[in-house]
Amino acid sequence: ETALYIINKEYTRALAEKSPKAFSAEPQKILSLRLYDIAASAGTGTALDTDVGYSKINVYGNPTTELADFAIRVRGNSMNPKYQDGDVLLVSRTDEIERGELGIFMLNGESYFKKFGGDRLISLNPEYSDIVFGGGDDIKCFGRVIGRLKR
């Protein structure tokens, strides 16, 4: 008797969860982000200017996208295998990141998507050498990469 009682109770609970009122969740929040037209290089570098054009993209709100200030497209393969050419990165604007974090950088007028190594920018693809900073280099961080959009 006890097993049959438990089975019936579980069956009733399962039916209740599938009722239409169980699916009356709030609509998912849509966020609008700037997608900058110039790609951050995952390779040898491309120019990035503060007056770069952008388009707007809509993304579903979630804990990651809600922290993003803008998006930017990857160009190149130096961050393979984790990041591919054409991936759209979600970026939280900041001018400082910790060693080991991924970021968008400008070094001497060229933009990069790399891992920050303190005195260098590091590619994830071992076929690419580190970019070591010299005394006269002009380095700026535009933001921390916090995720990417699924294709």
Feature roles, as predicted:
Residues G118-R151:
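Glycine- and charge-enriched low-complexity intrinsically disordered segments
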Residues P20-A22, L89-V91, L102-F105:
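Short, hydrophobic/aromatic-rich beta-strand segments within well-structured domains
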